[in-house]
Design a protein with these regions (language model features):
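Phosphate/nucleotide-binding beta-alpha loop and adjacent structural elements of enzyme active sites
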Residues: 1-223
């Protein structure tokens, strides 16, 4: 029956005159499905999920890779005040904002990038808005995807496997990754802990930036 309705609808409405109408339906349907609701963590569903997941865990250990100015960190503490958060933010301007925004003795911040190997890399951001939420290790995210001029910062990058061993962190309750296209490399750098099943949950961003880094969901499937 439903297929029959689709066929009839196509006969009547699959016309040039209805293109704008169907584009409108498409975009509001995406929002209804929870896609592209990035205006705040409530609309995105992140806030509700954090509350459900963290509320019954005693003293959860949370790793925030790509902490930006601390919005996610605040949501974590709202979900469970006993959380201990390790937050990584490589951009020097954004890192200062992060520390100014949140004062909590259960938060440790690090002005570091995270990837699949230790070293130094260039972090790119908007020439006219340095310190944005779109800073990326991929210059094309700024120049091609967003069509803007880019400025760069040399940043130190670490592997999480090394960091966890140095800080004697045995189990991670939640690993959050939002690195504007570098999410897969972050996971490659924590392969030991993933293999040993020491990370209970992973929350990562996947969007158009992954076109630039040439990563698909199939890559993440190995984990």
């Amino acid at each position: 029956m439903l297929n029959y309705i689709f066929i009839i609808y196509s006969y009547i409405f699959a016309r040039k005159n209805f293109v704008l109408f169907h584009k409108f339906l498409y975009h509001i349907s995406l929002r209804g499905l929870g896609i592209l609701n990035h205006h705040n963590s409530y609309l995105a569903g992140e806030k509700q999920w954090l509350s459900r997941y963290l509320k019954n865990i005693n003293n959860p250990i949370v790793i925030d890779v790509g902490a930006n100015i601390g919005g996610y960190v605040n949501d974590v503490f709202e979900a469970n005040i006993s959380s201990f958060v390790y937050a990584f933010e490589p951009h020097p301007i954004t890192y200062r904002k992060l520390n100014n925004n949140i004062a909590n003795d259960k938060l440790k911040t690090f002005n570091l990038g995270v990837g699949n190997e230790k070293g130094k890399l260039e972090l790119f951001d908007y020439e006219d808005n340095d310190g944005s939420a779109h800073a990326s290790l991929y210059k094309e995210v700024i120049t091609d995807l967003h069509g803007k001029g880019a400025v760069s910062h040399s940043v130190e990058v670490i592997k999480l496997d090394d960091f966890f061993m140095d800080y004697k962190i045995d189990t991670i309750d939640l690993l959050k990754i939002d690195t504007e296209g570098n999410e897969y490399n972050v996971l490659l750098g924590v392969e030991k802990y993933l293999t040993e099943k020491k990370i209970k949950a992973i929350h990562f961003e996947f969007n158009e930036m992954n076109i630039i880094s040439k990563i698909s969901f199939k890559n993440f499937g190995i984990y």
